Amino acid sequence: LYNEAQLSDNPSLTESQLGFSPFVIDMFRTNEDPIMFPNVDWNDYLFKNLAWQTQHNLTLSGGGERFRYFVSLGYLLQDGMLKQLGESYDPNYQYKRFNYRSNVDIDITKSTLLKVNIGGHVGAKREPRTDELWRKVLWSTPFSSPGIVDGKLISNIYSNRYISIGERSCPLDYYYNYGYNVDTDNVLNLDLALEQKLDFITPGLSMNIKGAYNTNYNVKASRTPS
């Protein structure tokens, strides 16, 4: 089709001036040399048909006359849409989160109640270090690279002198050669409440003392292949 478009614009072009010579077309047809003349569907090569999400929750509650508790634990894993193609590390998109909550009521005395509530989460988001990947998948030609062959990434076929058109960069360069970032977020919320009944002064009178501590910090880490 590219040749036909060229001839439609300029019918006087010779075979040597066309984007794809008969030799090149025949090499694609026979798949005789898939290294020098690859034909890769990058969407199918790189992307999964689906990305799994798993979530688990555990809840416990109980206690006795003077001690009562509630504990909730949760874990979430969201996998990415990109395939793992055998490299020694995985730069795929991923999100993991562990969340927790604990509520404890303690009757210190018959008139004194202590409430301790703890909650928070730890989340880690991983993603490739470049935002060029999606654009390169759309722009790259099927013959820009054969991908990973025998465990080795063949990024660009600069020696291929037979084809000079199209985007020659390989999406795998932007997937594997730039590394990845991991962004970890840690949130902790703690609050305490002390309830003291003062019926000995006036029936129904009580005193509440409350305190809270909240913290949130973020850690960013990067890995770049050597």
Task: Locate the predicted segments by residue.
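Individual transmembrane alpha-helix segments
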Residues: 176-180
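Flexible loop and strand-edge segments within Gram-negative outer membrane beta-barrel domains
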Residues: 34-74, 78-81, 91-169, 181-185, ...
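Carboxylate/His-rich catalytic cores and anion/metal-binding grooves
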Residues: 216-226
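Short, solvent-exposed loop/turn segments enriched in Ser/Thr/Gly
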Residues: 187-189
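N-terminal, post-signal-peptide soluble/periplasmic segments
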Residues: 1-35, 110-127, 131
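Membrane-embedded beta-strand positions of outer-membrane beta-barrel proteins
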Residues: 71, 116, 192, 207-211
